[in-house]
Amino acid sequence: MWSLTVILLISYFLGSIPGALWSSKALHGVDIRNHGSHNCGATNAFRVVGWQAGALATVVDFGKGFLAAGVVASVIRIDPIPSGLSLFGGDPFVVLGLLAGVGAVIGHMYPIFARFEGGKGVNTAAGMLFALTPLTMAITLAVFVAVLLSSRYVSLSSITAAVAFPTIVALRRFGFGADLDPSLLVFGGLLALSIVVAHRSNIQRLLNGTESQISSFEPAQGMLGRGEL
């Protein structure tokens, strides 16, 4: 049980690395929590300081989830595996990867290194799930890109992709006989729900027609580059 605790703690601290905040401060000396949406995530980094910090934040946030689920959960061995990790009839090693990934997502949303003011966890969750089921996540990312290109709303793209993931898992498992662990479907559904809840203010702005859109897919200058800070 101590090994499981260590995995969760390491994953939380890994997730707590505030990629958007630190990249924005390092490259531009700007605390993005004071500007834009005030969210400490990659999208706000793009919006406030431009593509360089935003791209770096995206890679860091994705990597946190990938490393937690794909590396931390594998390097620190648990022997024997607690029977409770076979929840939902799933492979306990897959469930362990999911728990480690969730630890990183929680760290991203409530980072100890940034006064517990984090992002919404979409990129970190994507990294976690890519480590565990890369083909499903590749399809999900294609859905994200398609919605983004057609709507120009990052929030709508994130919400759609979150709902698409468990749907794709179900279709692949039950429709095409893919050997996908059932825990992916359960966790995917719970994660989709949490991401939708985290975006409730965005949903309200989408309904009101006041949500910010991407004006151009050229490398973003951000508010800083446009002299708006």
Swiss-Prot record:
Its main location: membrane. It is a multi-pass membrane protein. Its EC number is 2.3.1.275. SMART domains: G3P_acyltransf. Coiled coil: none annotated. This is Glycerol-3-phosphate acyltransferase. It comes from Salinibacter ruber (strain DSM 13855 / M31). GO terms for molecular function: acyl-phosphate glycerol-3-phosphate acyltransferase activity. Catalyzes the transfer of an acyl group from acyl-phosphate (acyl-PO(4)) to glycerol-3-phosphate (G3P) to form lysophosphatidic acid (LPA). This enzyme utilizes acyl-phosphate as fatty acyl donor, but not acyl-CoA or acyl-ACP. HAMAP family: PlsY. GO terms for cellular component: plasma membrane. It catalyses: an acyl phosphate + sn-glycerol 3-phosphate = a 1-acyl-sn-glycero-3-phosphate + phosphate.
